[in-house]
Amino acid sequence: MKTLICGPMYSGKSTALFQRLERFLFAKKKVLLIRPKKDDRGYFTHSGGIDLDKLEKNNPNFVILTLKDIDESDAKSIANDGFDVVFVDEYFMIPGAHHLCHQDDYDVYFGGLLADSESELFPETIKILPYCDKIKKLNGVCIKCGSELGNYSFAAFDKKEKIVVGDTKYECLCHKCYKEAQHEKKINKEAE
């Protein structure tokens, strides 16, 4: 089974991944967590309290890999290593993560943003969506008005900037506040 857990920042994607990961460890399954090399936040979820290094050290069925990208041979190697389930945190930052979809030897849970600040799907999102048996879309909370159904915005920053997970320039906004921010950004750009 292939599952995608997506949503805006601060919606609980990594926490949802971890809850599922814990269940598999409790069931004594062999679990692999793949994290992107680009993610240097130093924590797994905003809610804290999760020490992945300690969990890996104390559990012989749990392995963490930090990867820059994934190719087809990596996906096959994971199958050969006997993993029952693979979790990919911030999948959109790992080119080739979609290769994991082509293996039937293990279940895969992808977690991360669905789209960029302009609501354009990430290339990896486009490649994994057709293979996902389940898609769980989580909602965030708008940092401006507090409503649910978050969207994405770089506020006053240039779209050309790369998204860095946990970046303070990245905001979770509802559709109304997102449109207002886009309008304000346009006015500021015209004033320059």
What spans do the regions from the language model cover?
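Catalytic P-loop NTPase motifs of RecA-like helicase/translocase cores
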Residues: 92-96, 117
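Short, cysteine/histidine-rich loop/knuckle motifs that typically chelate Zn2+
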Residues: 144-147, 176
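Conserved P-loop
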Residues: 1-75, 116-127, 140, 152, ...
